[in-house]
């Protein structure tokens, strides 16, 4: 015997219909939340990597070792945070030529592509490029 709703009409199949209509919407929202979370976590990791890279470059004695130390430090920071993005690290070492006793800085920029293609969300790009820059002072009294 069919179940009758309070208003006297049939109530059969409404739950299945609601599920069919709402499931794609809920999955879309869930995908957006996951993408936002992944991007937010990656932003923090890339920012920390840029800071670490600039600090390591600032304690190096030559521009060549500064570049190598910055790249190594950025990769280690991203690996520590669980982000696998093959970073591009650029270091501005132009101020290594500033005479001792004068203030100088070194700037590190880290670029990282965060993959989003594994999330099946319509309209979402396949990846997002994150870029962070940090400037660290060079010791004005240390020979460069």
Descriptions of predicted regions:
Residues 2-4, 59, 63-144:
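Short, conserved structural patches
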